[in-house]
Amino acid sequence: MTDPLLRAHLAPEPRTLVDILRATADAHPDSPAIDNGREVLTYDELLDAAQELAAALRSDGVRRGDRVGVRIPSGTTDLYVAITGILLAGAAYVPVDHDDPDERARVVFGEAGVAAIVGTDLVIRSGPAARPDADPDEAAEEDPELTDDAWVIFTSGSTGLPKGVAVSHRNAAAFVDAESRMFLQQRPIGPGDRVMAGLSVAFDASCEEMWLAWRYGACLVPAPRSLVRSGMDLGPWLVANDITIVSTVPTLVALWPADALADVRLLILGGEACPPEIGARLATDTREVWNTYGPTEATVVACGAQLDGQPPVRIGLPLDGWDLAVVDAQGQRVPDGEPGELIIGGVGLARYLDPEKDAAVYAPMPGLGWERAYRSGDVVRFDGVGLVFQGRADDQVKVGGRRIELGEVDSALLGLPGVSGAAAAVKRTEAGNRLLVGYVTADAGFDPKAAAEQLRASMPAALVPRIAVVDTLPTRTSGKIDRDALPWPPPGASRGTGATASGTPDLELDGTAAWIAGHWAAILGSPPSAPDEDFFDLGGGSLSAAQLVSKLRERHPDVTVADIYEHPVLADLAQTLDAMAAPTGRTNAAVSPVPRDTQVAQVLGTVVVRSIGALRWLTWIGLGLLVAHRVVDAPWLPSIAWGWVLAGWLLLINPFGRVLLGAAAARLVLRGVGPGRYPRGGRVHLRLWLAERLVDEL
């Protein structure tokens, strides 16, 4: 009987990401590739822009096999032009989130040895490995090969420094093609689909978002960073932007009403454990919901399971091309149903930039007969249907979908002035949030707020913990720190800030401040102890800020996540809320689905709109026939009147005619429509939709 966990022999045919992009552009040249809400690039236009950037990179000395840094604001078209341009130049892109500290960018680009860095407005500057004497005339176009790297993504490292993981084109393209065999087999993804891009490009799951669109001719729709931070406000955005494909973390999906996903037909979850209620609530006959699993070291996703709402929530079976095994401490397979460490092999195995670490982590597994394998550190069991995630076997954790090595946080804490001992741990709050807490033993003059600022200057926000000062750090009999025994709630999140050991505030608050403090206590694990407490110093992040806003909107409907970032101090936030309009007791507005009659009308309207393109092609054919009759004696060719061809050229090909015809069509369709509010899916909505499509086609 074939082992369902061994699928390396089913790996897709070798090719590169450049091969995939060009094949899609050839098949769907006029389909939208990127729509950022302000501009739309077709696949032809994306390829042209990327080739222009690739040429500029070659002129600046970038050659095939080099690495190029990317640091461009999220949600912009330039970000994706940069990524595709670097790939077309034959180089690998090395992303750093635009919001990360400059020190993080310096470390990442230095460790990667980038030859150039592409920044805002696609400005290119030299990197640490630049070739200033390179001859632009020798910059021949050279496509990447299968063994060349496509991207290098840095993850949290146990030594205190981030680790660079290099993914080759063979790895990446195999992942993209293997996923095409998993999702939506009955109704494959295609040019009509719109894929949300909401993840930071420094997070490897962003690669899944991009290629879920670009593998099939669908449109990538970047979500504004402000909406991603707010969480709940992404729901209406999904509806307004006709999003049909979403890949995200369960924590974010939990903030959206089910109606916000009415048009979503594929929902992919990953990055953290998926609660059972997510699948039960969101899986429908018209929507596939998948729970996926995979470390960066094995190219984004190694396995997945379609959720049907029934427990247990599995991480499923491997992608075609990946091998999985569950082993004991001696590296031998365990019986089905028994827990063990998950080992990954196959075509998706990436590599570390550090050769020593690569050799240690991607080691042979003699007990499996594998020459190279990745030890995940995750404990799973195979229940006969698929793999079930059990937890971690080491000090690596996931918070908000981001993988974190507690050792890296420990090292950063120990580097703070006045700290003599440190240990990071993840604790769960009353609201179910996982909170990263840094416990330190320190001198009497230790300033936690200054320490937090120092950490923010050198680390991504997700790695900056809530700081709690303790007298001693508990240890096991082995002498190692016992992270499980670290106190929660903490005895003091910071000096003069935080809660007592009982979790009660050490300063009485009243009015709006007391009401906010109650929500802070549920979301962050303990209440603030003073009016000058800072939400983010107590461990708040983007997702917990979104949760706080959802609570505050019960009284103050106009509050946004931006208000939390602008007024993180308790007293300041309370004053801001008091200055807002009188509380109204707002409830979340339901997102109405488009009526089926309107959907049918849109399908019929699409046929009419597409016929305009067909007439344009017929005009070109007619023009070709007329020219052929003039230059070739071919009586067998069909004849056509000059008048019809001239009319078609004036209205459907000539730019001035197309503009006039588009304007006239829009005015005719929208005749009588004035400013105002109209129901979603109503006649005015349909007329606006048709006018927009007519103008786009013309």
Regions found by a protein language model. Name each.
Residues 1-7, 16-18, 117-142, 172, ...:
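AMP-dependent adenylate-forming
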Residues 30-40, 62-67, 386, 390-395, ...:
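Phosphopantetheine carrier-protein modules
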Residues 37-41, 69-77, 96-103, 198, ...:
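Glycine-rich loop motifs involved in handling phospho/adenylate chemistry
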Residues 76-87, 404-408, 514, 521, ...:
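Phosphopantetheine-attachment site and its flanking helix in carrier
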Residues 78-80, 91-106, 137-336, 341-349, ...:
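Motif- and composition-driven signal specific to adenylation
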Residues 98, 421, 427-436, 459-481, ...:
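AMP-binding/adenylate-forming catalytic domain of the ANL superfamily
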Residues 585-698:
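Terminal amphipathic alpha-helical/low-complexity segments used for targeting or macromolecular assembly
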